From Swiss-Prot:
SUPFAM superfamilies: HAMP domain-like (SSF158472), Methyl-accepting chemotaxis protein (MCP) signaling domain (SSF58104). Residues 347-401 are annotated as: Disordered. The keyword Cell membrane applies. It is found in: Cell membrane. This is Sensory rhodopsin II transducer. The chain crosses the membrane at residues 17-37, 279-298. Residues 347-394 have a biased composition (Basic and acidic residues). It is a multi-pass membrane protein.
Length: 764
């Protein structure tokens, strides 16, 4: 089945083109899939690196902010005014801190906090003065930090206050010179992440504390609420960067060194890998464009090419079916136009060949109408024409096949292997046209050589049959000559016997004259006469039978001569066909020489083959003309012998009639003798009548003797004619042997060429 599929693919250009397009599409899809996988892998690495790097950078940013906030808070807490106890000066100083450009980012207020009473004694914002943070749930008040030295700084957990609509965190530093007071920077938590942009579209940055609550979130309502992400990610991010891709979200986390916080950067998976989707869609678009482009190429170029090839194939099938009037015109001026021109040239050549075949068929039909006995020959001619048409169809179908390499094939052809073909499926247009032309020409030469080989075999067989028939005819002529010699001897013997009868009749006449003298011897004489008459009658009957045999033999010999003449006519028809084939082969060789001259140096080997074929064709034609002249002479001699044999048969028939008359006369003599024996009383009168009858018998016997002599002479002439016929048949036998030798020589010459023998001898 695999070989059949391969053969089907190799036998259809459309299938090849479709398969090629499918292979290209599959390769495009494969390459696109590979590129997509590579892009996806690289994109995943890049997204992971980007998000992780962003989380690290923002954690570093927060750590830097915390360090700055700690330093600024510690530095501000060391100002002497804070320990002076002057509330006005302290308030003015706090207001200056809150409005200073050097304050940490996000600071919205500065307070002096009494750790003992947990109240804000002074503030840059009047709303916070006197407020008890513990009552508001401030972590630094509910869980007051401890300061080992005045250099300690504490960052408290975020919380909310009624006076602000945003969550705040506090940075506390003890005020030197006091025992229970600390400077607090109140910071808007939202400002901690305001500077963080979106390195991935749709991404968000949050800060989560160690207890799992949001320190900062784009949604203010989520601040100070529990973290809803994977706890594994949060636990890992406390000590090292972490990354996770789950639930349609990619998250990268990094720890903040200056606080128990983790910075989380989140992005929707589809947004983070939007580039991958874009690449995928681009690849799909590219593949679709490739498929559409290839489809358009297949529909435009491929379909037109396949359509043109199918049209040419259909035209070739029509030509192979015998329709040489099919339209091969095309408006294309490319390779298909050249191919159409080659098809037209081939059609014209085939038309001429078929015209010749039709003419041969017409001649055969005319011959059939002239004589029914030639119907077989006409049928053979029609079969020859049909074979020629089939050969032409095979030549047309042979255009669809391909063979071996040009140089190797032409070398093999030059060496005599006419079965080789060139591979005409070449990209080079001229070589493709030359390949088609060479294949056509090689098909014609191979068909002609195969036909000539088959014809040579048939001529050899026919010559052998003629030689055998001539030998049989020689044997028949020898038999005829022997029979005629026997007839001549019989006729001579018959003449002698008739002379004896004449003597007996003379004796009978003398006895009749002596009857009057003695009646006693009448019975003896009558008995002798009856015996002699019986012998004569028996001799005449033998002569009649012998003449019948001679007539039959002569008629058989004449029929044999007619049959031989018919065989000579058949051989003449064969010789005519040989001459026609020789002329056609000569014309084919001339066309091959012209084609070889047109192809230049590439056709030198082919020109040698064409010249050799032309020489063989001329020798075949000369041999056919020689055989035809010999057959005409032999046919004339055979006709003459047949005419002579019929004349001999007619002469023998006449002699038979004469001998029949003699037999009748002898019967009368027997009657007379009987009358003499029964009528003794009328002996004298009967004796007179007997004398008269004896005289007539003597005359009849003389005539029979003359006829016998003439029969002997005719038999001698027939024997001479038979000898002449034997000599003529010997000449026929020699001519047939010579014809067989020439056919064998032609067969030896044709044997130098290897060709497929697809022609049966009876086709000729």
């Amino acid at each position: 089945m695999g070989s059949g599929l391969v053969a089907r693919i190799r036998g259809s250009y459309g299938t090849k083109l479709t398969l090629a397009l499918v292979v290209v599409v599959v390769l495009s899809v494969g390459v696109g899939t590979f590129v997509y996988q590579q892009t996806t892998t690289q994109l995943e690495t890049d997204v992971r690196a980007d998000l992780t790097g962003s989380a690290d950078a923002r954690a570093d940013h927060l750590d830097a902010w915390l360090s700055n906030a700690r330093g600024q808070t510690q530095l501000a807490s060391r100002h002497p005014v804070l320990a002076s106890g002057n509330d006005t000066a302290i308030t003015r100083y706090l207001e200056g801190l809150a409005a200073s450009d050097e304050r940490p980012d996000g600071v919205v207020a500065a307070h002096v906090y009494n750790t003992s009473t947990t109240t804000i004694e002074a503030s840059s914002a009047d709303a916070f003065t006197g407020v008890n943070p513990r009552e508001q749930g401030a972590p630094f008040a509910t869980d007051p930090p401890s300061f080992a030295t005045t250099s300690d700084v504490v960052v408290a957990a975020p919380f909310t206050v009624p006076a602000a609509d945003f969550p705040v965190l506090s940075v506390l530093s003890p005020i030197p010179g006091t025992t229970d007071k600390a400077l607090i920077y109140m910071v808007n938590v939202n400002t901690l992440t305001d500077d963080f942009g979106q390195n991935v579209a749709g991404s968000t940055t949050t800060v989560v504390s160690a207890d799992g609550t949001y320190v900062s979130h784009p949604d203010q309502d989520r601040v100070l609420t529990g973290h809803d992400g994977p706890s594994r990610l949060l636990n890992q991010s406390r000590t090292q960067p972490a990354y996770i891709d789950a639930n349609g979200t990619v998250t990268a986390a990094a720890p903040v060194d200056g606080a128990p916080w983790s910075v989380l950067v989140r992005a929707p998976h589809d947004r983070a890998f939007a580039l991958g989707d874009f690449v995928a869609s681009s690849l799909v678009g590219l593949v679709l464009i490739t498929i559409v482009s290839l489809s358009l190429i297949g529909v435009t170029v491929g379909s037109t090419t396949v359509t043109a090839l199918r049209q040419f194939s259909r035209r070739a099938d029509e030509m192979a079916a015998g329709d040489l009037d099919t339209d091969i015109d095309t408006s294309r001026n490319d390779e298909f136009g050249t191919l159409a021109e080659s098809f037209r040239s081939m059609r014209d050549s085939l038309s001429e060949s078929l015209t010749d075949a039709e003419r041969a068929t017409a001649r055969a039909e005319d011959a059939r109408e002239d004589a029914e006995q030639q119907r077989a020959d006409a049928e053979a001619a029609r079969e020859d024409a049909e074979a020629a048409r089939k050969d032409a169809q095979e030549t047309a179908r042979a255009l669809e096949s391909a063979a071996a390499d040009y140089e190797e094939a032409l070398t093999a052809v030059a060496d005599g292997d006419l079965t080789r073909r060139v591979d005409a499926s070449r990209d080079h247009d001229a070589m493709a046209r030359i390949g088609h032309a060479l294949n056509d020409m090689l098909d014609d030469i191979e068909t002609s050589v195969a036909a000539a080989t088959a014809f040579s075999d048939h001529v050899s067989d026919a010559a052998q049959r003629v030689e055998a028939d001539a030998g049989d005819a020689i044997d028949a002529g020898t038999d005829v000559s022997t029979a005629v010699d026997e007839i001549s001897d019989g006729a001579t013997e018959q003449t002698d016997r008739l002379h004896e009868v004449a003597g007996e009749v003379d004796d009978l006449s003398a006895s009749a004259e002596e009857v009057a003298e003695t009646v006693a011897s009448l019975a003896d004489t009558a008995g002798q006469a009856a015996s002699a008459v019986d012998d004569g009658r028996q001799a005449t009957e033998d002569a009649v039978e012998t003449m019948d045999d001679v007539a039959d033999d002569a008629e058989a010999a004449a029929d044999a001569m007619d049959a031989l003449d018919s065989e000579m006519a058949d051989i003449g028809e064969i010789v005519d066909v040989i001459a026609d084939i020789a002329d056609q082969t000569n014309m084919l060789a001339l066309n091959a020489s012209i084609e070889a001259a047109r192809t230049g140096a590439d056709g030198d080997g082919f020109a040698v083959v064409a010249d050799e074929v032309k020489t063989l064709a001329e020798e075949s034609r000369d041999a056919a003309e020689d055989i035809e002249s010999r057959l005409l002479a032999l046919q004339g001699q055979v006709s003459d012998v047949a005419d002579e044999m019929r004349a001999t048969s007619d002469t023998v028939s006449d002699g038979r009639a004469t001998v029949g008359d003699a037999a009748t006369a002898l019967d009368d003599v027997v009657s007379f003798v009987a009358d003499t024996d029964t009528a003794a009383g009328e002996i004298r009168a009967a004796t007179d009548r007997q004398a008269h009858a004896a005289s007539r018998v003597a005359s009849a016997v003389d005539e029979v003797a003359g006829i016998s002599q003439e029969t002997a002479a005719q038999a001698t002439a027939v024997a001479d004619s038979a000898a002449t016929q034997t000599d003529t048949l010997s000449s026929v036998d020699d001519a047939a042997a010579d014809l067989a030798d020439r056919a064998a020589a032609l067969d030896d010459l044709l044997a130098e060429f290897d060709a497929h023998d697809d022609t049966e001898p009876e086709d000729y």
